[in-house]
């Protein structure tokens, strides 16, 4: 079965360019603003949209994304409301893939089977669940694949050649390479190290590889995009959003444009280079 992610990466390969993958927390700073930003992302240049599912114990997230999750929870964001945002986005945008990223606990509480039915119906294309290792594929990964939802796995600098086949076994859509060891937003990605790591992953899979963590500027995104099929930017966008909020954490008049302006600049950087693999 061909998914939106398969189609998008195949189209980009024909165009000879990498994808800009954007991450924002659903419901940050509120559901209405979150949907407005999401609707504006494709036109600004986002090729794939990652949406965070807010969770009370986000162990892999740095301070910026943790704070975004807390703002979203304070605004009343739930997993059901996150799916509603995707559903509303889909009313006007059929082509751009949407990937939900987060932790297993909210999905487990929602109910895996019910979640997959609702996610598919809402227009979700893929899942990144950071705390489910390959050894637990029966929990969510295999049911997701059966439901026609891509399951995207993370590879890191510490994922060696012995471990990589297990990580990649049931991965689909793309592989997410975490360019630094640690939490989101903590350091800058090293493009030489990224190039070597992506080449190593490519020896084990034909899937597109997207690189995230440590990419904050159009220049950095362009450097990384030379080595892979996509550059993922999250913390920088969350920081741009946060900078527009008032003292109570409410959206300001330029909250949407602050995010989309940065996305447009990042897109210009990413789309202006030809990946080595193209």
Curated annotation (Swiss-Prot):
Transmembrane segments: none annotated. It catalyses: (1S,2R)-1-C-(indol-3-yl)glycerol 3-phosphate + L-serine = D-glyceraldehyde 3-phosphate + L-tryptophan + H2O. Keywords: Amino-acid biosynthesis, Aromatic amino acid biosynthesis, Lyase, Tryptophan biosynthesis. InterPro entries: Aldolase_TIM (IPR013785), RibuloseP-bd_barrel (IPR011060), Trp_synthase_alpha_AS (IPR018204), Trp_synthase_suA (IPR002028). Gene3D superfamilies: Aldolase class I. GO terms for cellular component: cytosol. The active site is at 50 (proton acceptor), 61 (proton acceptor). The keyword Transmembrane does not apply. One of its GO terms (molecular function) is tryptophan synthase activity. Its EC number is 4.2.1.20. It comes from the Bacteria. Pathway: Amino-acid biosynthesis; L-tryptophan biosynthesis; L-tryptophan from chorismate: step 5/5. HAMAP family: Trp_synth_alpha. Tetramer of two alpha and two beta chains. The alpha subunit is responsible for the aldol cleavage of indoleglycerol phosphate to indole and glyceraldehyde 3-phosphate. Belongs to the TrpA family. This is Tryptophan synthase alpha chain. It comes from Afipia carboxidovorans (strain ATCC 49405 / DSM 1227 / KCTC 32145 / OM5) (Oligotropha carboxidovorans). The gene is trpA.
